[in-house]
A protein has these predicted regions:
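Conserved small/polar residues in nucleotide/adenosyl-binding loops
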Residues: 150-151
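Extreme N-terminal starter segment of soluble prokaryotic enzymes
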Residues: 1-3
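NAD(P)H dinucleotide-binding glycine-rich loop of Rossmann-like/cofactor-binding domains
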Residues: 86-147
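Exposed loop/turn and edge beta-strand positions of beta-sandwich/beta-sheet ligand-binding modules
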Residues: 17, 29, 62, 102, ...
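Glycine-rich beta-strand-centered segment in the early N-terminal region that forms part
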Residues: 22-39, 49-92
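Cytochrome P450 core scaffold surrounding the K-helix E-X-X-R motif
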Residues: 43-45
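Conserved hydrophobic/aromatic beta-strand scaffold that supports enzyme active sites
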Residues: 18-23, 65-67, 97-99, 105
Length: 151
């Protein structure tokens, strides 16, 4: 049976609990994914600590990458065996296997590892938002991507 890390109360790392989960089958516009790598983000610590309150108990984690095990009805853009990455709610990326809506998943190109894909999603989306929405980057301007230097 797959396992998932959940929190039942707020606190430090000691509140993370490993539990067996019954994943089931995907519904319409959903995919069942086996995660091969997860991304760890500051927001995960905010959720765990209660700084960003959650309804408890709750899964935790926003981003991961893995392989599709099963596709639900109406899914045409993904197939069983596709490598994908995702970042968004619902929380629960700290799982061996889970079901996610297709709208939060993207295919991972050949040559990109699950580890790379899992760590790029939230940071990449944040960077895209900052340079395309918050401040429109202009020609000859310089940007330092501090959150991406670990890759």
């Amino acid at each position: 049976m797959p396992k998932s890390i959940i929190i039942k109360k707020n606190g430090g790392p000691e509140v993370l609990e490993l539990q067996d989960v019954n994943v089931g089958s995907p519904g319409p516009d959903e995919i069942k994914v086996t995660n091969h790598a997860i991304g760890l983000n500051f927001i995960d610590t905010y959720h765990r600590s209660g700084l960003y309150p959650l309804t408890l108990p709750s899964g935790i984690g926003l981003e991961a990458a893995g392989k599709i095990d099963e596709v639900g009805p109406n899914v045409t853009e993904f197939n069983k065996g596709d490598n994908i990455a995702y970042a968004s709610i619902p929380l629960g990326a700290y799982s061996q296997q889970r079901i996610i809506p297709t709208k939060i998943a993207v295919k991972v190109p050949d040559g990109i590892s699950h580890k790379q894909a899992a760590t790029l999603m939230t940071k990449g989306l944040t960077t895209n938002y900052l340079i395309c929405k918050t401040y429109i980057l202009k020609a000859n301007e310089t940007v330092l991507f501090l959150s991406l230097i670990h890759i």
